[in-house]
Amino acid sequence: MYKILIADDHPLFREAIHNVIADGFPGSEVMETADLDSALGLTQEHDDLDLILLDLNMPGMHGLNGLMNLRNEAPTIPVVIVSAEQDKQVVLQAITYGAVGFITKSSPRAQMTEAIEQILNGNVYLPSDVIRTQKSSPRRSGHEEHGISPELLQALTRKQLLVLERMTKGESNKQIAYNLDIAETTVKAHVSAILRKLKVHNRVQAILSAGDIDFAAYLRR
């Protein structure tokens, strides 16, 4: 079904993720490695990989430098960070450096399965509990730091705000459609309008920009 590489230096965690994939995506081919050099080698041998699940702290990684090296060597293979790290800035930097998702190792099994499914379907997955936390620096609010002014937010309709709020929770278009009781095509239209009105280029930028927004305040208008 899928071809997935797990790159993590902890055997027990590799086994746990392997089991998540085996149960959630039967028939998938799973490869494992415990260091960055081996991961880079496998991407050269298997350029048809559907996904790489990458630990930030395994040998050779040097934090996000390893992610950048992997993206440079295998730019067509989606990479998801799987880490015990829960610092919001690390999550944001990982996405900036080319990861298509970030899964915390403390995530429940069902949440990991859902995250992998979203990513394999072409969506981006971000841990909503981390993204919604306030930054440690009090200098600016999230929407100011990422360029979303109150004026831009006020241009969104109520329904678009509801869709954006769901996006920041890591929901796919299908989930948003179900939760808001609207058609998936309508959700896609709202997402396109949101990107245009917020002057961002993609879904990831919209999610990151909206991470600290108090949606309740805007929805009370």
UniProtKB/Swiss-Prot annotation:
Originating gene: agmR
Residues with PTM 4-aspartylphosphate: D55
SUPFAM superfamilies hit by this protein: C-terminal effector domain of the bipartite response regulators, CheY-like
Coiled coil (residue ranges): none
Species this protein is from: Pseudomonas aeruginosa (strain ATCC 15692 / DSM 22644 / CIP 104116 / JCM 14847 / LMG 12228 / 1C / PRS 101 / PAO1)
DNA-binding region: 173-192
Record-level GO BP terms: glycerol metabolic process; phosphorelay signal transduction system; regulation of DNA-templated transcription
Residues in HTH luxR-type domain copies: 149-214
Origin superkingdom: Bacteria
Keywords tagged on the record: Activator, DNA-binding, Glycerol metabolism, Phosphoprotein, Transcription, Transcription regulation, Two-component regulatory system
Name the UniProt record assigns to this protein: Glycerol metabolism activator
